[in-house]
Design a protein with these regions (language model features):
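Membrane-embedded catalytic cores of phosphoryl/pyrophosphoryl-handling enzymes
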Residues: 1-138
Length: 138
């Protein structure tokens, strides 16, 4: 919200409420980690994963369906309720990559530029590894 950053130049939004990182399989409450903005590691891992897949398959146009371990019909929320089974379908790798990074914003963990830079860094790392490590067998 900007209200607790101890910066007098920040105009806080008193109506901002992050979803918070969901507490799973425990009674601990949801939380928003108290760390400053950096390129998102979560977005970086996603950028590396999806860029590796694009490099390997030679296309971004791969549709797939994913079920998170958070919403698998088994995992308990912080008050002991079973979370529903929810599948998410993606039309492309880049759509999943973007949503993966965006999730950190909804949780109140990162800003949009953290997502953008995290994805960019992950892609660069994937390209470096893919182009310099993986070689075809003769």
């Amino acid at each position: 919200s900007g209200l607790g950053d101890n910066n007098l130049a920040t105009t806080g939004d008193p109506n901002f409420t992050p979803l918070g990182a969901p507490g799973s399989n425990s009674s601990s409450p949801n939380f928003t980690p108290p760390f400053p903005a950096y390129p998102s590691g979560h977005a970086g891992f996603g950028g590396a994963l999806f860029q590796t897949l694009r490099n390997f398959f030679g296309t971004d146009d791969i549709a797939f369906t994913f079920i998170s371990d958070e919403l698998n019909g088994v995992t308990l929320d912080s008050v002991g309720n079973v979370r529903p089974l929810v599948s998410r379908s993606f039309a492309s790798l880049s759509q999943a990559e973007e949503e993966n990074g965006q999730s950190r914003i909804y949780l109140g963990i990162h800003w949009s530029f953290d997502k953008t830079e995290g994805i960019s860094l992950g892609r660069k790392i994937a390209d470096q590894v893919f182009n310099n490590t993986f070689r075809p067998n003769p």
